[in-house]
Structure formats: C-alpha cells, structure tokens
Amino acid sequence: MIRRIVGKTLGLLGYTIQYGCIAHCAFEYIGEVVICSGPSMEPTIRNYDVLLCDNLSRHFFSIHKGDIIVAKSPDKPSVNICKRVIGLEGDKVCMSSPSALLKRHTYVPKGHVWLEGDNLDNSTDSRSYGPVPYALIRGRICLRVWPLESFGPLKESPNGRIQDNWP
C-alpha cells in the first residue's frame, strides 16, 4: 500500500519536473507573454499591455532598426526593459533629446544596439546607460494580445528617431 503511494507520488513528481523543464525551455528559447509597465513606450505600448515576445529572433534572425525588443536592463539585470532599436553596431546615433539645442552624437560599438523608448521625455534608455550588448536581448515583440481592441502588430515609432543617416 505505502509502496504504491510512494511510487505514484514519485511518478507524479517526475512528470511535474519534465513538464516544468519543457515549459522553461519554451519560455526561454521560443517565446513568452510579457506584461509591460511604465510610460516609456507610450503611445505605442500602454501600461499593462500584454505582448507576445518571440525569443527565437535573437538566435536565428537579425535585429533591425525599429524593432521593439525585450532586454535585460544594463543597470538592473533582474529587470527586463522593453524599448525600440534605434541604432545597430556602427550606426551614428543622437544622444540628445529632440528638444536639445546642441546635438551630441556617438557611434554604436560592435556587438551592441542603441535602445530608446517612444516616450522620449519619460524614458530611461541608451541615452542614460549607453549602448546595450546583444547578449542582453531576450527577444523581439511581435504582437499585442491585450487589450483585444488593440490586438495585432505594433506601430512604427511615433517620434521619427529612426533614420539611416544622422546629419
């Protein structure tokens, strides 16, 4: 009797561990659901929007200018950030806010990207902490799933910061 209960308990524990490992691999390497908080990506992404993040992108496809990505924060590695890619390695990017009279530029180093929020006045991004290493990128946002009235792919940058060549 006890042997049968122990056997069933161990079997259930084994299945739980298996499914836990499968779920971990799926969320880590294939994709995950992300709930965004904070105003840095408004109006494109609002507080508590639910997004689908494609984690395969970082392994098999190139990250492009204009993509919205999820990355580990360079300042706080335990926190994920959701920002738009403004520059790729070798690109010249503007470090100043759009309202600044004197514009400062820099080049994105090899193996890094330049990230900015769409709400430039209320975003802590590469203008604060500098270029972000590719290794910190977790995935690319591909779809908004909630709220349902906004279901679908995300819009282009509303502030026009993505340019091929800065003056």
Swiss-Prot record:
Pfam families with a match to the protein in the record: Peptidase_S26
Bilayer-crossing regions: none
Presence of keyword Hydrolase: yes
Cross-referenced InterPro entries: LexA/Signal_pep-like_sf, Mito_IMP1_subunit, Pept_S26A_signal_pept_1, Peptidase_S26
Main location: mitochondrion
Any one cellular-component term (Gene Ontology): mitochondrial inner membrane
EC number of this enzyme: 3.4.21.-
Localization: Mitochondrion inner membrane
Protein keywords: Hydrolase, Membrane, Mitochondrion, Mitochondrion inner membrane, Protease
One GO biological process term: signal peptide processing
Active site per database record: 40, 83
GO MF terms held by the record: serine-type endopeptidase activity
Uppermost EC category: hydrolase
Xref: PANTHER family: MITOCHONDRIAL INNER MEMBRANE PROTEASE SUBUNIT 1, PROTEASE FAMILY S26 MITOCHONDRIAL INNER MEMBRANE PROTEASE-RELATED
Similarity-based family: Belongs to the peptidase S26 family. IMP1 subfamily.
Record note on quaternary structure: Heterodimer of 2 subunits, IMMPL1 and IMMPL2.
Function: Catalyzes the removal of transit peptides required for the targeting of proteins from the mitochondrial matrix, across the inner membrane, into the inter-membrane space.
Protein name (database record): Mitochondrial inner membrane protease subunit 1
Native source species: Xenopus tropicalis
Gene: immp1l
